[in-house]
Amino acid sequence: MKRPIERLPAATSSATRAFALATSLLYACAAPAASWTASWQASPQPVWAEDFLFPSNVPAELHDQTVRQLARISLGGTRVRIVLANTYGKRPIRIGRATLAKPGSERAAVATGSLHDVTFGGRRTATIAPGATLLSDPVAMPVTALSQVLVSLYLPAATPMETFHWDGRQTGWIVVGEQTQSHALQLDAADSQSTSARLLLTGILVETETATRTLVTLGDSITDGASASLDRNSRWPDFLAERLAPHGVAVVNAGISGARLLSDGMGASALARLDRDVLAQPGASSMVVMLGINDIAWPGTAFARNAAPPTLEALIAGYRQLIERAHNRGIRVVGATLTPFEGALPGTPLSDYYHPAKEALRRQVNEWIRHAGAFDAVIDFDAALRDPEQPSRLAARYDSGDHLHPSDEGNRAMAAAVDLDVLLDEVPDGTPAEPRADSATK
């Protein structure tokens, strides 16, 4: 809470008053401390076996190859750091060299004069231990909000791909040899590859001249952007970042396709990854939670044929744990209702994803999210996307075609539905506000 202005007693000596005045002027004139803030994120997942329902779309191993990845940051800064992860690896990963640059006009090309070496403890080479992350040294490369950066990583030794982010919604490139310094890659070479997954790169931090805030979106494939257009930055957190950038607020996406609240899915459960993906993010002050539809719909499908469906009480207990743990770290928690899914995933091995009993549980969950007062605010994505004539279905104009994931227009509508005044309503000292029934939906 804000502290009241403290006045010196009238009997205070003139010397004491002079000292107090000098001290206050010193603090008033001091330059604000620089602050490191998360500006981009891709949550790590374990690479699954070849017999899994979906292909991983990444090589089993890289050796003497360079990976170049493009990422759009949400907030700018004066310097940049990258975060690499070997979260699920069983062996150390050697980084032979890394560079950071701004993209040129051609695909995978570096803008002239923008190439910077990335170092780790002052060295160009580094090793990521199994289960560990690696934070780079600061790179003096000023970047602006919503701009793109190119990260190139050279892997000189045989490197099994055991950690990735499956659905990056952005093309990356893999070429033979040490090409981190190359301004243009030979993408038409027979041994070059492309992937839409994120490899090793899990975070980008920026240094700002004043303290800033980061909003983390914790979710599943709807947040991760399944069905969003490739290379368009058209996930709902991307559109929300465009709205929040003028307010100096970063948005980082902690969505994982196939994620669940209570149990592991195509990645760790939200309860298991909260510390890593949200609480540990520099500058994190708020998070939006949109999770639960896979918990409800997976049982009885090819993903979890014999699993029992969760109870409403179990889901509520999971949400409350997320809220309590975030509040314990001074992070505000905004709940988002679950969007309609009748008819989801037709013609796929998951065509039994929808069932009327599952729909009934979704509606119960949404009523609790809206009215329980457990969250600091609520975003009603269900109301924003549902067909008013058939509320168990997505409105046709927002449906990507699989009746589960929103289209680009649907993602834009989700971001537009958010009331920024309520979303950003925080107590000045970072203490979470008392739970309130206000909606963060327009």
What is each of the regions a protein language model found here?
Residues 271, 297-299, 339-442:
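Catalytic His-Asp segment of secreted/periplasmic serine-dependent ester chemistry enzymes
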Residues 17-28:
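Bacterial N-terminal signal peptides
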